[in-house]
């Protein structure tokens, strides 16, 4: 039998970012090179001052340097890198400072628009700062005046990266080493939202003036059929419509097309920025009210309120010639317009489960 769910569920467990893993392994390897001993754990300080002890899978001599590895623990967050082996390979160099390299499974930046220059390893700024700070402190403690060559790798990272937005962002060959706080908050989805922002920034930096933000593969396909947009212009927003709309305040484009399943667009029309079922639900009475404004009969309104799904309510409305899909898109456009700068032309499209267009609303610009 299935076990009953406890009335008071246990609190979700936080984890550590790939940036924290890279810092811990870099420090352990560098310490070994500067006369330290092989250890099975290392303590690091996170950006906000928390001290954490991270377990090592190995710490050993490697070629003319040293390497250390740790398993990424994302806590209870559904992170693609959870359980992956993150490792650092460190060599000493005569020149002071730290020079970063992409080890196996870590990507390289190939397009402008990110916080890293083209050609740089995809080790983000905060993880770089963490590693630099820890290695500088170690060098001072050991009286070492030279520098470090640091290569960060992730076992299986090239394959894992295909499940992320890295290929579309132009980060090729592997994963990015991420993190701003050093801690992964369960279901905070901060990495996903950051990748949405990066996608917009990369599109802008590469001269793209029209982007299409889509909730999934079917809506992306619909936008491909409608427009000859390059892949870089397709932004996989998932449930995070707010991440797109708010980012355009500081990083506007000429035109934004929003496309998603009818249910998702219905939530946006109802004033929700997070379209996931955990945070928003479809308001069937609201849909019935919009249908009423289009002349829907009382019987139709009642059947829509009793519908099992938004798709069923849509089918009922369309069967009576009520253009509910267009109305929902118009309400979604009106809500989005209140967030997005007026310089950005807006349009909204809704599709059914087969990917067919069932509604649209486009602004007329003079």
Curated annotation (Swiss-Prot):
GO-annotated molecular function: cobalt-precorrin-5B C1-methyltransferase activity
Keywords of the record:
Cobalamin biosynthesis, Methyltransferase, S-adenosyl-L-methionine, Transferase
Look up keyword Lyase and say if it applies.
no
Q: Which reaction does it catalyse?
A: Co-precorrin-5B + S-adenosyl-L-methionine = Co-precorrin-6A + S-adenosyl-L-homocysteine
Q: Which residues form the signal peptide?
A: none
- Top-level taxon: Bacteria
Which Gene3D superfamilies does the annotation name? CbiD-like
Please indicate if the UniProt record lists Transferase as a keyword: yes
EC number(s)?
2.1.1.195
Q: Note the SUPFAM superfamilies from the entry.
A: CbiD-like
Q: Which GO terms describe its biological process?
A: anaerobic cobalamin biosynthetic process; methylation
Metabolic or biological pathway? Cofactor biosynthesis; adenosylcobalamin biosynthesis; cob(II)yrinate a,c-diamide from sirohydrochlorin (anaerobic route): step 6/10
**What is the disulfide pattern of this chain?**
none
Q: Which NCBIfam families match?
A: cbiD, PRK00075.1-1
Q: Which family does it belong to?
A: Belongs to the CbiD family.
Name of the protein: Cobalt-precorrin-5B C(1)-methyltransferase
